[in-house]
């Protein structure tokens, strides 16, 4: 193990006084126990680092400012103005790539070699062109199926079809021919997002959003042409499509993304569909016996004022106890129901936990202060339009979402591709906190590990960076655990609240974490770190953050600081997992 240390290179404009060791009177140390698993898929040098900042704060770093919509579960930088984001395809009311504006005068001299190493190895992406929402996931006859919004003609949004891929392990994927194309009047402007339902008799129902020749969003039905085909190569659209149209009072561009169906006590199937009334996000409930004719419930499943259009809704149960997933139709005292909506206004996936009342077909959140669009998120980075499915093969619920890059449209055209899917995650109820979900990469990803490098009892003093010699690798699965020295009776944690100040916002404990995608001079790097703060009640709050501001030297890439509060219970250590193929973080 290399025990040498070096100072954290200061941000441009940072006072060099604070880039090295703090005064001796302010020095503290903490212990980091790190286990780094390296899967070498192709050669590229990368240095693994652990970082801890001393308690000083540079004078040019502003403290975290919370706006009037701030909630303790999330933090965003003051420079982030999601309300001004303009996604591609906005006029058509669909989810598409959205980035805060980057000056047209900024550009970077990208090369093909640079673009090639940006292709991922852990994450699914097509061979070329544009991809967005995951659609209709299911397990059938030994194969996991992933459908996805796909433009076969270009690396930007448009001409949306359903791409199709299959896998036996959720990691290695086989590309298949396009499953459905925009070839009918009711989906002439796009075969948009939808969901699969496996029926007890073995039938498969696929409901999707069609955008008609007149730009009206409708729900359409399709089914496999040959159920004996495990690859489900061919799909047939129902001759009576569309099966649902926007109800009275709903705009024709605000009715989309039917969910997986579930059964009620009367034996009828239910689905929910996202919409809005003025600025109130809502989810309609429809009943059906044959998936061809429907009746709308008198009320709505749920509504939250001020959240705007709800799209890509997901609705499913999670067991209060145990480590297994729950089939979508289960509803009893042993489960809670998750309602998730992708907010079109902000391009954020929010979820909430609550109770589903079958008698009036409404869902009520456990905590109104953490309602859909207000509190919890699946993810605080680039993540949208997520979808779960129940994997009957391993009795688990699997979650997947869409990640779009923060570069420009011209970069996408130069690369020839855009967007990836997240690593599939299992979803469970956190019965320790009782207030949130636990997400974890599926176990199959561990099969990609080729070499293990183990570091333990690494002592890191305040204001230092410790280099860990992991050899040559480009794909890493990093597990790191930190143990902090206990506070002395006279000490308090005086860090700024949240993640907004970034990795140079220093407190008594923190930030501490790891640096990934770092060059030798530490001028280009991405800190993934914990930060501690005091609550108004005097308790210690833990935040898990990522600081992208020095993640790339390219000026035409949007960079931000993001993160959220994470529960760390008494007696637990600070644990993080980072998949360094795309850089995805999980903390607890």
Swiss-Prot record:
Protein name (record): Acid beta-fructofuranosidase 1, vacuolar
UniProt similarity note: Belongs to the glycosyl hydrolase 32 family.
InterPro entries attached to this UniProt entry: Beta-fructofuranosidase_N, ConA-like_dom_sf, Fructan_Metab_Enzymes, Glyco_hydro_32, Glyco_hydro_32_AS, Glyco_hydro_32_N, Glyco_hydro_beta-prop_sf
GO cellular component: membrane; vacuolar lumen
Domain of life: Eukaryota
Transmembrane segments: 32-52
Catalyses which reaction(s): Hydrolysis of terminal non-reducing beta-D-fructofuranoside residues in beta-D-fructofuranosides
One protein family per Pfam: Glyco_hydro_32N
Taxon lineage: Eukaryota, Viridiplantae, Streptophyta, Embryophyta, Tracheophyta
Subunit-structure text: Monomer. May be present in two forms, a 70 kDa monomer and a heterodimer of the 30 kDa and 38 kDa subunits. The ratio of the levels of the two forms within cells appears to be regulated developmentally.
Subcellular location(s) of the protein: Membrane; Vacuole lumen
Tissue spec. comment: Expressed in buds, stems, roots and leaves. Expressed in the epidermal cells of young leaves and of primordial leaves.
Active site per UniProt: 133
Post-translational modification: Glycosylated.
SUPFAM superfamilies documented for this protein: Arabinanase/levansucrase/invertase, Concanavalin A-like lectins/glucanases
Organism field: Rosa hybrid cultivar
UniProt xrefs under Gene3D superfamilies: Exo-inulinase, domain 1, Glycosyl hydrolase domain, family 43
Principal EC category: hydrolase
Residue intervals on the Cytoplasmic side: 1-31
GO biological process: carbohydrate metabolic process
Biased composition (Basic and acidic residues): 62-71
């Amino acid at each position: 193990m290399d025990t040498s240390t070096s100072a954290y290179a200061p941000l441009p404009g940072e006072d060099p006084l604070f880039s090295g060791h703090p005064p001796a009177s302010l020095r503290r140390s903490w212990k980091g126990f790190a286990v780094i698993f390296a899967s070498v898929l192709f050669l590229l040098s990368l240095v693994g680092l652990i970082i801890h900042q001393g308690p000083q704060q540079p004078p040019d770093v502003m403290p975290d400012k919370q706006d009037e919509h701030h909630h303790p579960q999330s933090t965003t930088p003051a420079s982030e103005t999601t309300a001004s984001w303009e996604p591609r395809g906005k006029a058509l009311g669909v989810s598409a790539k959205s980035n805060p504006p980057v000056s047209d005068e900024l550009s970077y001299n990208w090369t093909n070699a640079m673009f090639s190493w940006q292709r991922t190895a852990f994450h699914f992406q097509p061979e070329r062109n544009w991809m967005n929402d995951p659609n209709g996931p299911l397990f059938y006859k030994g194969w996991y199926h992933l459908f996805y919004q796909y433009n076969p003609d270009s690396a930007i949004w448009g001409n949306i079809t359903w791409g199709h891929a299959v896998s036996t392990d959720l990691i290695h994927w086989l590309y298949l021919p396009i499953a459905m194309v925009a070839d009918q009047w009711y989906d002439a402007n796009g075969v948009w997002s939808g969901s699969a339902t496996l029926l007890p008799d073995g039938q498969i129902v696929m409901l999707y959003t069609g955008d008609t020749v007149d730009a009206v969003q409708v729900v359409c039905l399709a089914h496999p042409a040959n159920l004996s085909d495990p690859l489900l190569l061919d799909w047939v659209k129902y001759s009576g499509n569309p099966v649902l149209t926007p109800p009275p009072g709903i705009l024709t561009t605000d009715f989309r993304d039917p969910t997986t169906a579930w059964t009620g006590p009367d034996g009828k199937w239910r689905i929910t569909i996202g919409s809005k009334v003025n600025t109130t996000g809502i989810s309609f409930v429809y009943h059906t016996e044959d998936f061809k004719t429907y009746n709308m419930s008198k009320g709505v499943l749920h509504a939250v004022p001020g959240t705007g259009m709800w799209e890509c809704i997901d609705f499913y149960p999670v067991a209060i106890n145990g480590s297994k997933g729950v089939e979508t139709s289960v509803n009893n005292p042993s489960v809670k129901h998750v309602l998730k909506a992708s907010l079109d206004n902000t391009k954020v996936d929010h979820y909430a936990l609550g109770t589903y009342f079958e008698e009036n077909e409404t869902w009520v959140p456990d905590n109104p202060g953490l309602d859909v669009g207000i509190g919890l998120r699946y993810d605080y980075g680039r993540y949208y339009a997520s979808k779960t499915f129940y994997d009957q093969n391993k009795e688990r619920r699997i979650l997947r979402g869409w990640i779009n890059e923060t570069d420009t449209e011209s970069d996408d055209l130069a690369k020839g591709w855009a967007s990836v899917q997240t690593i599939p995650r299992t979803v469970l109820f956190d019965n320790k906190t009782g207030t949130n979900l636990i997400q974890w990469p599926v176990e199959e990803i561990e099969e990609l590990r080729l070499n293990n490098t183990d570091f333990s009892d690494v002592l890191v003093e305040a204001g230092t960076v410790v280099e860990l010699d992991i050899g040559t690798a480009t794909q890493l699965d990093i597990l790191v655990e930190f143990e902090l020295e206990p506070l002395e009776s006279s000490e308090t944690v005086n860090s700024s609240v949240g993640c907004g100040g970034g990795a140079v916002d220093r407190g008594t404990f923190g930030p501490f974490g790891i640096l990934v995608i770092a060059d030798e001079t530490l001028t280009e790097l991405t800190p993934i770190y914990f930060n501690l703060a005091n609550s108004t009640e005097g308790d210690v709050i833990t935040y898990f953050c990522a600081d992208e501001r020095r993640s790339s030297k390219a000026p035409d890439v949007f960079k931000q600081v993001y993160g959220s509060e994470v529960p760390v219970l008494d007696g637990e250590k600070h644990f993080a997992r980072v998949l360094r193929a795309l850089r995805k973080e999980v903390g607890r």
